[in-house]
Curated annotation (Swiss-Prot):
Main localisation: cytoplasm
Gene name for this UniProt entry: ruvA
Organism from which the protein derives: Desulforudis audaxviator (strain MP104C)
Descriptive protein name: Holliday junction branch migration complex subunit RuvA
Region (Domain II): 65-143
Family annotation (InterPro entries): DNA_helicase_Holl-junc_RuvA_I, Hlx-hairpin-Hlx_DNA-bd_motif, NA-bd_OB-fold, RuvA, RuvA_2-like, RuvA_C, RuvA_C_sf
GO aspect biological process, one term: DNA recombination
């Protein structure tokens, strides 16, 4: 898998860009909001990527952050959601608003995305809420507080920290959100839900 591209921006279209890396031009599908925020052609850009492999075509999708790519990949796991629809959701809502909508079970905000009807919105809610609860990482959550944010002490808190990191948040962002919770006696899933609500409201 091509994890990211760093190269010269050649062309910008409403929903795609061309990036030159090592003399090769890569056409990358991106949300319109990202395309509009990129610098002028000729400047260097950095995009996290996902390569979709089909029998008839290869398509690359680009994101400004690992957090957005994580949300895109989770959406791809929902039945009936393809890469272009997943990209539209991430581009229209943004990852933090998406997580907050899922936790509030707000299907209305999802149906504002072209191509997402009520049934698809409900399916996303059910499947992603379950995945958010079960998301795990294969790294230790007990990371040093080198950024000045206190390390969390409880087991549930560290499990929640690991889950938030696996969703694409930085250790600092995750610890800050968990440290802001008024109720720290929840289980790991409860802590994750509460922290996502805080970050989704920012």
């Amino acid at each position: 898998m091509i994890d990211f591209l760093k190269g010269r921006l050649v062309s910008v279209y409403p929903e795609a860009v061309v990036v030159e890396v090592g003399g090769i031009g890569y056409r990358v599908q991106v949300p319109p909001s990202l395309a509009a925020s990129l610098p002028e052609p000729g400047e260097t850009v950095f995009l996290y990527t996902y390569l979709s492999v089909k029998e008839t075509a290869l398509e690359m999708f680009g994101f400004s952050s690992e957090l957005d790519r994580t949300a895109f990949l989770l959406l791809l796991g929902v039945a009936g959601i393809g890469p272009r629809t997943a990209l539209a959701v991430v581009g229209r809502l943004g990852t933090r608003r998406l997580w907050a909508a899922i936790l509030r079970e707000d299907t209305g905000i999802l149906t504002t995305v072209p191509g997402i009807g009520v049934k698809s919105a409900r399916r996303i809610m059910v499947e992603l809420r379950d995945r958010l609860e079960k998301q795990q990482v294969a790294v230790s959550a007990e990371l040093p507080a080198s950024d000045g944010v206190p390390v969390l002490a409880g087991r549930a808190e560290n499990e929640a920290l690991a889950a938030l990191i696996s969703l694409g948040y930085t250790p600092r962002e995750a610890r800050e959100a968990l440290n802001r919770l008024p109720d720290r006696k929840l289980d790991a899933a409860g802590l994750v839900h509460a922290a996502l609500r805080i970050m989704g409201s920012q």
